[in-house]
Amino acid sequence: MRVNTLKINRDRLQQLLREEGVESYPLQQYPDALQLVERSNIFKSQSFKDGLFEVQDASSQKVAPFMQIDHSVKRIIDTCAGAGGKTLHLATLLQNKGQIIAMDIYEQKLQELKRRARRNGAFNIETKLIDPKQLKRMQGSADRVLIDAPCSGLGVLRRNPDAKWKLQPEFLDQIRTTQQEILQQYSKLLKKGGKLVYATCSVLPSENHQQVATFLASEAGKNFKLEAEEVIFAHQSGYDGFYMARLINNG
């Protein structure tokens, strides 16, 4: 789980959970993470109802810090926000300052994000249903852009081992096409000097490094440079498989 540092620190949350009969321990390489000692229905806990934490895989918790949020960051656009796990993490890193625009194609997911944001006390999040006209107006406006791209989900086989049998070549071809289209389109939202993070919960190079390389070789990516990338393998970390790449727009 990820501690909501807008409301509480990790030590205090661990103490409150213990008082509710839930034992946990900190993860040393994840500053806002607690791991449960054993499975528990923590969604019924008072700490959850009070918005003191969110359930989020440890690998997923690496994405927001990877974006290098500092005092100069005033606007972040989370382009594929879904129900907002990473959006809420970004809100804590901004300390409820600045503006986070959370976008998605599904209104239902954005409504869930709004509910979670209220529970978390995150007030710097604005949700937007993706609209081509709005996207054009937002070009060049963001200090940071997060693309948590739709993917095969092969990094989460640890939790969903049946997923690999559902993957067909046609699906992979389609998802890779979508990923590149998203990179081409949403990279335009970034300011000169801004940074974009492309992330997936897949470990397939064709969804990850190869997508970034294709983008950098394209007209849309000619002013971008790869700053850093990281692959997290589930068998090494014990958590979900993940990929992250950080690009800077040298415009």
Which residues make up each language-model segment?
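S-adenosylmethionine
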Residues: 1-251
